Structures are given as structure tokens and as C-alpha cells.
Amino acid sequence: MTHVFTIAIDGPAGAGKGTLARRLADHYRLNLLDTGLTYRAVAYALIQHALPLDNVSAAETAARQVDMAKLDRAVLSAHAIGEAASKVAVYPTVRRILVEKQRAFARTPPGAVLDGRDIGTVVCPDADIKLYVTASAEVRAMRRLAEIESIGGTANFTEILADIVRRDERDMGRADSPLKPAADAHLLDTSEMAIEAAFLAAMAIVDDVLTRRNKA
């Protein structure tokens, strides 16, 4: 790849888009950005400074200070931070600040794989490849439960499922940049698909685009 190449991956929480994004970025040697971590970083900053999540001005300041190169997944992956992130993500001004940072990241050679909720529709509407990765709420809840138990934690399936449904409703129902597939996105339903199968399906889509582009 000699030009900046962008792969946009969108979808609800727990559908497997993060794992898929990492696999694709590694395979095609592209930069990787989990845009959800940028919103989590804003929420984390507010929590660390004991500021209320509805303090829009403080959230805007935190958004401007987010460093894309220093997003600590281990710290930012906490469940409570994810819940808080969904709340600060509804502020249009915060979204605009972070979207500009995300776009700048995508423009950095050799290109990037970005995963989130509005990559193909808002952040990178001209992305070379757009994937919308989804799965049923029940499957996503089971995956989340297994993930928590794999690291020695405990959780309740019913509570996790209810949380996922609430988050879906919030993400899909917000007025600014709602979660939805781009009109030209390739749909990948991973409800009955292992990550390897999803990766191979996505790779086939990317390779097809690259092949046609090289022939043009």
C-alpha cells in the first residue's frame, strides 16, 4: 500500500469489531484506533477529577487533551468507564473535538483501521472499506460474561444483557451521530461466527477492493 488506506469498522458493543480491527491492522500493517477509547478517556478524566459527567465544559476540555498515542486500554476498559463514556458521547461539541482528532489519525500514513460507532458515517465517510459488525444482544452478553469470567471476575448475565440493550438504545437513539451502518457498508453478523471466520470474511472484502484498485 503506497497511499493512505482507511478501513472503517462500526457496530454495537460486544459484536467483535475490536478484535477484528486488531487482526486487520496487524495483517495489513496499518495504524489502529479504537475510537471508543477516546470517549472513555474523556469520561476517565472527569471521574479522576471528581467532575460530574454532565459538565459539558469540562468534558470539552478533557476531549481537547486526549492524546491518541497514550490511550491505555487496560485502564480505560473498566465497565464503569464504559457506562460513563456513553453519557459524555452524547455531547455534540465533545464529539466534534474527538472526531477531528480521529480524522487526523486516519490521515497518517500508511493509513489506519478505525473502529467505533460512527466511523463509516461521520468520521471517515470516504473510507476505502466500511464494515458494520453486529451480533444479537444475547450473544454479545454471553461473550461479555465469558470475558469477565476469564479474568476471574463475576457477573450476572441478565444484568449484562440489560446493560447492552440500554447502551444500544442510547447509541442508536442519540440525535448526533447515531449508531447505524453506512449505506455502502459490508454487513458482518458474527452471532454464529468465530473470530477467525469473521477475519477471513473481512479479509476477502479488503483483498477484493485492493485487487480491483490495482487493476484500475
Curated annotation (Swiss-Prot):
Keyword tags: ATP-binding, Cytoplasm, Kinase, Nucleotide-binding, Transferase
Subcellular locations according to the entry: Cytoplasm
Single GO BP term: pyrimidine nucleotide metabolic process
Ligand binding (ATP): G11, P12, A13, G14, A15, G16, K17, G18, T19
GO CC, one annotated term: cytoplasm
GO molecular function, one term: dCMP kinase activity
InterPro entries with a match to the protein in the record: Cytidylate_kin, Cytidylate_kinase_dom, P-loop_NTPase
Principal cellular location given in the protein's record: cytoplasm
Entry annotated with the keyword Phosphoprotein: no
Enzyme Commission designation: 2.7.4.25
CDD domains referenced in this protein's UniProt entry, alphabetically: CMPK
Pfam families, alphabetized: Cytidylate_kin
Catalytic activity line of the entry: CMP + ATP = CDP + ADP; dCMP + ATP = dCDP + ADP
Family, similarity comment: Belongs to the cytidylate kinase family. Type 1 subfamily.
NCBIfam families in the record: cmk
Protein name in the entry: Cytidylate kinase
Origin species: Mesorhizobium japonicum (strain LMG 29417 / CECT 9101 / MAFF 303099) (Mesorhizobium loti (strain MAFF 303099))
